[in-house]
Amino acid sequence: MNHLICWLFLIKRAAVNVKKIGQNFVLLQSFLKELLQKLQYMSNNATLEINGKSYEFPLITGTEDEVAIDIKTLRAVTGGVTTIDPGYKNTGACQSAITFLNGEEGVLRYRGYAIEDLADKANFLEVAYLLIFGELPTADELEKFHADIKEQSVVDDDVKKILDAFPKSAHPMGVLSCLTSALTAFNPSTVNVESEEEMYNATVKILGKFPVLVAWTMRKKKGLPLNYGDTSLGYVENIMKMMYEKPNEEYEQNDILLNALDKLLILHADHEQNCSTSTVRMVGSSHAGLYASLSAGISALWGPLHGGANQAVLEMLEAIREDGGDTKKYMAKAKDKSDSFRLMGFGHRVYKNFDPRAKIIKVAADEVLADLGIEDPVLDIAKGLSAEALSDPYFVDRKLYPNVDFYSGIIYRAMGIPVEMFTVMFALGRLPGWIAQWKEMRQRKEPIGRPRQIYIGENHREFKEISKR
């Protein structure tokens, strides 16, 4: 109401002042200044009315014009009123300068750079540097970064004993989370870090050791002896060799597969405040060490609603194959609201348009399949589902396009990576994003995360002795 009165008053003033333009230009300038100040005040605040009382809260506008209501003082000024937002669909837990995502327009940028440009022109290690330090590296900076990582790539032999203690049937994500957490015990200097140098050392250590843990986890799953990498190779080349090298065989690099994996890792490197990233920041807000925070993020990523989606895609494709491989039948089931079947790998919670990452990785998937010439009924089913969905008005109108999980699962299948390892590969790509988010949270000295709740349980009850219950 007060704002309406202000508007009416300003409009009245405008009518009077317009008549005086020729007589008093200074008066017009003063009026315009007053108007701008009033509009600025009105646009930078939000009014919340509770039980007839109004409260003003500032609006925060991001560099991409996202607007948020700053309610840090809500409980203090209202006498204890809080908000509730299950799933945090409308809640910003932080301000971040790392990744921008516009789901409506299908836009994804790391530090201002379009994901399309990075996937086409940069390699994974360059993108990791960009995310963690904010700028693309020079040639000298990248060389030093890689050299420092290689120097820290040796994993303590006692970590092998921990790995050996797991049964072969253990899920690789559980193994990876445990091994990552164990690194804290072998690298105590990475826990209580404050300075830029300490954060850098913790960063290059985990970037060096994490690929080894990933490769060991896969080799354990396949029954292959554990190995170390080749420091003469590039970062992703070394990862490939560690995963695929076989005893008594000379390893030969496949450039098509190398390019596809490099792109996949870039596309998965960060995705702003998703479940696992928010977990890393939340755990890190208690000043837990980087590796403990990463271990928690890995566990969050393990969930089938998050990182496990690409594994779910392949399991769905296998189920369709076992049922005869009729893709049209399953497309019809997906459109039937009374059917419990869900088409995995299509649509996205955030992207209301085509997932920009999926456009990129579809090309890589086509290249991989063409190069390997694999005859695989599961991959044929995947291609059939994709083609039908992209031409079916039901899916097109609802923007249910194949997402990055759909195509990444196809590539990993073609590369011979076990289905249970898919989410581990996701974690490998997401590592630099998690590091960047943890580092940003610590450097901005964000408070410990402590969400509120609305209690809906029993009111006070009197205790009864067991004989009277």
Give the ranges of each region predicted by the language model:
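Intrinsic-disorder-associated, low-complexity terminal segments enriched in Asp/Asn/His/Tyr and depleted
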Residues: 2-3, 24, 41
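Short, positively charged and aromatic/hydrophobic N-terminal segments
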Residues: 12-15, 19, 23, 27-38
